[in-house]
Design a protein with these regions (language model features):
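Glycine-rich P-loop/Walker A and Walker A-like loops and their local beta1-loop-alpha1 context
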Residues: 2-59, 64
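A short, acidic, amphipathic alpha-helical segment used as a generic capping/interface helix at domain edges
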Residues: 17, 116-133
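Long, charge-dense
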Residues: 65-115
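Short acidic, S/G/P-rich loop/turn micro-motifs used as interaction or catalytic elements
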Residues: 39-43, 72-74, 111-116, 146-151, ...
Length: 202
């Protein structure tokens, strides 16, 4: 059986007036995962933008916050230092090398999994959801977990971000599939089960 398409996701869930209320759905952890074939990455990204356009139309009036977790990590690194050097600058210097030095890999892993980075995303989300607007604000959509791998996994992000998800619904787009109680990034790499998040399209 084919999995739910993005268009069906909109028709069956996102445009549903009851689901558009932050207090409905999974009340304990209002986080949802949409799985897709990683080969469809750029098509999915285009469709995510289309979702935002459809949700802001008069029949919904919803202003959706969409974030690329990889792009947000790069922005976060702009102000981060490794000694006297900008971490982002060090990465740029090593762009032409076949293999990134282990010291930089370790720093990137630690930064991506840091409380500071999770707070950085939370601050951006709070700014959006608390800013006065005539539009409803219900959804935070996150994608880019294929790009930020191996430094941050979707399961790690969700476990650490759970305490921040209040007053809105978090939707994570996952480039892989769910099978045997576990998520598989790119259909290959094991990612832990995120028990408290709801899989939208099993």
């Amino acid at each position: 059986m084919d999995k739910m398409t993005i268009s069906e996701f909109y028709d069956q869930l996102l445009s549903d007036k009851e689901f558009q209320e932050p207090e409905t759905g999974n009340l304990f952890f209002p986080a949802y995962i949409y799985q897709y074939d990683s080969q469809d990455e750029y098509n999915i990204r285009t469709q995510i933008v289309n979702l935002k356009d459809r949700l802001i139309r008069p029949n919904n009036f919803i202003d959706t916050l969409i974030l690329n977790i990889y792009d947000e990590f790069i922005s976060f690194l702009k102000d981060e230092k490794m000694g006297d050097e900008s971490i982002l600058g060090l990465i740029t210097q090593n762009d032409n090398e076949k293999e990134m030095p282990d010291t930089i890999k370790d720093v990137l892993f630690n930064k991506a999994n840091s409380l500071e980075f999770f707070n950085y995303i939370n601050t951006k989300a709070n700014t959006h959801f608390k800013e006065p607007s005539e539009l409803k604000k219900v959804y935070l959509m996150l994608y880019g977990f294929g790009s930020i791998f191996p430094f941050l996994r979707a399961s790690t992000y969700l476990k650490n971000f759970e305490e921040h998800v209040k007053g809105y619904k978090l939707i994570v787009f996952f480039p892989g599939y769910y099978e045997n109680n576990n998520y598989h990034l790119f259909g290959e790499f094991h990612d832990e089960n995120i028990y408290r998040a709801t899989l939208i399209n099993p």
